[in-house]
Amino acid sequence: MNIAVLGYGTVGSGVVEVLTTNRETITKRAGEAIDVKYVLDLRDFPGDPIQEKIVHDYQVILDDPEIKIVVEVMGGVEPAYTFVKKALQAGKSVSTSNKELVAKHGAELLALADEKNVNFLFEASVGGGIPIIRPLNQSLTADEIDEITGILNGTTNYMLTKMDTSGADYDAVLKEAQDKGYAERHPEADVEGYDACRKIAILTSLAYGMQVDYEDIHTEGITHITETDFKYAKAMNMGIKLLGTSRREEDGLFALVAPRSEERRVGKECRSRWSPYH
């Protein structure tokens, strides 16, 4: 089976590497070999074996009947949305890790995939390697979900844990996270809560069967959390986590991303409450 990968950045190159390194195992599980025929990118990569597969014109991929699956790892809404929509319209299945795209246009793209009898898959957009999308789509379809709450961003969870355990301030912990590669040089998507917001929008849309625009969800990040906040939290035997939550209410849905104070786990019981750190 021939596939095309859209984007050859950190994620795209990782996809190609995994498919190459684990080729034998993947072939056994898939029942056939999966070959990367094209990689779409604006850049060239002289000296890299991938260069022979690089294309700059997306139409080449659309017009090739051998391409059955398009893997979109470009990030952002555009041009990813346009490219994914065209792939589905051309009868090609799409797999994406693009949480912003799924949160904004997921319902439309799922409907289009169903109409064209192909797949639009986005398990990697939420939870990394934790399977959550498929259970919501398949295993829990007969259940009525009342609430979803979780830690949806690993970077901020690492930072808050370090602030809690070491007493370090926000700036010091952010620099450490960046030095270790846990946080980007421009970390706004993580620390302002935007990443978690897009993820809770995706989960909410799937759980409750309606499109939820992440721009409508009130979102607060962790940039205002201080050492003093942790001192007060510890005095109450609480910790602080950035949580995304959504729940069904009588007049619709409630969704929020914000720091939340959570009672430290004792035995099997754990209680939480909304944080006053606004």
What are these regions (language model features)?
Residues 1-89:
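N-terminal glycine-/serine-/threonine-rich beta1-alpha1-beta2 phosphate-ribose binding loop
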Residues 75-77, 153, 260-262:
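Short glycine-rich anion-binding loops that position phosphate/pyrophosphate groups of nucleotides
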Residues 81-86, 99-127, 133-136:
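Rossmann-fold NAD(P)-binding glycine/threonine-rich loop
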Residues 94-95:
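A short hydrophobic/small-residue beta-strand
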Residues 138-198:
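Conserved anion/nucleotide-ligand pocket segment
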Residues 173-265:
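Substrate-binding/catalytic subdomain of NAD(P)-dependent oxidoreductase enzymes
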Residues 267-278:
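Positively charged, low-complexity/disordered segments
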